[in-house]
């Protein structure tokens, strides 16, 4: 399988040279997921100039921090949301390059040296935190297989983790997109214009969350529940096609979700709690 993929990649490289310069990520996607459209979260990493919206330093001021109940998601409902992006400039590395850079806390000085990042800088501190989270998640996944959570440092490793979790490569991904505004969007009221269920066979999904790092790193974990694509109209005319994930498996998904259950007045595991995915995150499901 690996040899056939390599051969196909060489053919695509030759074809790209005759027409346009396709990126390694685009070529890999065409081979690995030929029938699945590339989500905006990946497209924007390939063309970072198109994702120059500002990032929020406050996790409580992002679209992903707003939790609600499934019954409250209907045309005409209103929510105050803030669509933000991860720090600009984080590249999506090809697997070969990503694998050549260590990814371990004990190797952080070497990592910073390879990537020319000053020790003690905000970026270095964020990387230290992400490495610690990824290492803790890996250990927890080994002791509690029900809540597997891994970190992917390349598109190839992400797709393999997703395929392993869902039991097939016949998958596709969806992500949130602000469709008519390239720059930063303010925190404002949005009206729900339309709600469309995402087909989720067996209720099995895999979420991929961008993590703060010098290059694109995703936290990958499985969830069980429902998903929707939601058309949102902002007070200033901003339009968004947002992905909402609704799930009740609060265990292993952090304090924020547990706090959401308290605010919404429901018991953990009894009722699904929903949240929108930030633009940098993705949700994968079987076709």
UniProtKB/Swiss-Prot annotation:
Q: Which cysteines are joined by disulfide bonds?
A: none
**Record's InterPro entries?**
BURP, BURP_dom
Annotated signal sequence is 1-21
Tell me where in this chain the BURP domain is found.
67-287
Which SMART domains is this protein grouped with?
A: BURP
Organism domain of life? Eukaryota
Keywords tagged on the record: Signal
Q: In which tissues is it expressed?
A: Expressed in shoot.
Classification via PANTHER family:
BURP DOMAIN PROTEIN USPL1-LIKE, BURP DOMAIN-CONTAINING PROTEIN 7
Full protein name: BURP domain-containing protein 2
Record organism: Oryza sativa subsp. japonica
């Amino acid at each position: 399988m690996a040899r056939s993929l390599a051969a196909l990649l060489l053919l695509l490289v030759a074809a790209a040279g005759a027409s346009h310069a396709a990126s390694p990520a685009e070529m890999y996607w065409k081979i690995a997921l030929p029938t699945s459209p590339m989500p905006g979260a990946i497209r924007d990493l390939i063309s970072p100039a198109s994702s120059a919206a500002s990032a929020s330093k406050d996790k409580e001021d992002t679209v992903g921090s707003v939790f609600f109940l499934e019954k409250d998601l209907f045309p005409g409902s209103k929510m105050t949301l803030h669509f933000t992006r991860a720090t600009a400039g984080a590249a999506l590395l090809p697997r070969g390059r990503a694998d050549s850079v260590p990814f371990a806390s004990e190797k952080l000085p070497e990592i910073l040296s390879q990537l020319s990042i000053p020790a003690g800088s905000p970026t270095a501190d964020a990387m230290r935190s992400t490495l610690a989270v990824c290492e803790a998640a890996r250990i927890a996944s080994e002791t509690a297989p029900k809540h597997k959570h891994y970190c992917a440092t390349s598109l190839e490793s992400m797709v393999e983790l997703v395929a392993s979790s869902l039991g097939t490569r016949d998958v596709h991904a969806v992500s949130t997109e602000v469709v008519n505004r390239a720059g930063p969007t303010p925190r404002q009221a949005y009206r729900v214009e339309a709600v469309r269920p995402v087909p989720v066979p067996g209720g099995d999904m895999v979420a991929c969350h961008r993590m703060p790092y010098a290059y694109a790193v995703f936290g990958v974990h499985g969830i069980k529940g429902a998903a929707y694509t939601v058309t949102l109209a902002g007070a200033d005319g901003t339009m968004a096609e947002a992905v909402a994930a609704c799930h009740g498996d609060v265990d292993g998904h952090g304090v924020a979700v547990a706090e959401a259950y308290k605010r919404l007045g429901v018991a953990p595991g009894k009722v699904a709690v929903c949240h929108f995915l930030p633009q940098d995150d993705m949700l994968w499901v079987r076709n």
